[in-house]
Amino acid sequence: MSEILELEAKSRTEFGTGASRALRREGRVPAIIYGAGKTPVSISLEEKEITKYYRKPAFISQLINLTIDKKKYKVLPKAVELHPVTDIVRHVDFVFLEEKTQKMEVPVVYEGKERALGVKRGGYFNIVKRRVTLLCDVNNIPRNVTIDVTNMPIATSLKSSKIELPKGCSFTTKKEFVLATIIGRRGAKTEAEGEQQAAEAGK
């Protein structure tokens, strides 16, 4: 589960390109919160602070307590606009979290892929899914899904039915899908072939 980030924002009543430019000259970033059947709320954030947090891993799945005029709102980042040259945050869309569960897209981390059994035997680790869509308890939103693939053999696929998800999370589809495969290169040995050759060498 990701830690809850505490951020402060100011409400804003002036809109449009001119108002946004004026905010940025003051070192602030325009943003908006919407969703959950609520009236959208226009806010501004401190530019250096939001850019710093954006550059940390998995910001887009970061649960945030946003304080606006002494009121707290539980939100999630939805979209981030960056400056094309400096990568400084220019605008952020947030969504209100009012439901008990939230549909989330989170990154997948394949732990041990460089030293996976199939890779050691000459195979190539092929990532099919870099992100997966989950339905998560809003109090248990993971920053990522980590999968240990160290023991994955050559010429095999990693399927969703074999994945243990973080507590309070499930895939949004019941249909099985492939996340990764280890593809055999020419001359690569499958586990069975390797064992057979080892046995023959021992005779």
From Swiss-Prot:
Q: Does the keyword rRNA-binding apply?
A: yes
The SS bond pairs are none
Quote the InterPro entries the UniProt record gives: Rbsml_bL25/Gln-tRNA_synth_N, Ribosomal_bL25/Gln-tRNA_synth, Ribosomal_bL25_b-dom, Ribosomal_bL25_C, Ribosomal_bL25_long, Ribosomal_bL25_short, Ribosomal_L25_dom, Ribosomal_uL5_bac-type
Q: Which UniProt keywords apply?
A: Ribonucleoprotein, Ribosomal protein, RNA-binding, rRNA-binding
CDD domains, alphabetized:
Ribosomal_L25_TL5_CTC
GO CC, sorted alphabetically, is: cytosolic large ribosomal subunit
Which GO BP terms apply?
translation
- Gene Ontology molecular functions: 5S rRNA binding; structural constituent of ribosome
Source organism, top-level taxon: Bacteria
Q: Which Pfam families match?
A: Ribosomal_L25p, Ribosomal_TL5_C
What is this protein's function per UniProt?
A: This is one of the proteins that binds to the 5S RNA in the ribosome where it forms part of the central protuberance.
| Family from the record | Belongs to the bacterial ribosomal protein bL25 family. CTC subfamily.
Subunit comment: Part of the 50S ribosomal subunit; part of the 5S rRNA/L5/L18/L25 subcomplex. Contacts the 5S rRNA. Binds to the 5S rRNA independently of L5 and L18.
Q: What is this protein called?
A: Large ribosomal subunit protein bL25
Question: What is the organism lineage in this UniProt record?
Answer: Bacteria, Pseudomonadati, Pseudomonadota, Alphaproteobacteria, Rickettsiales
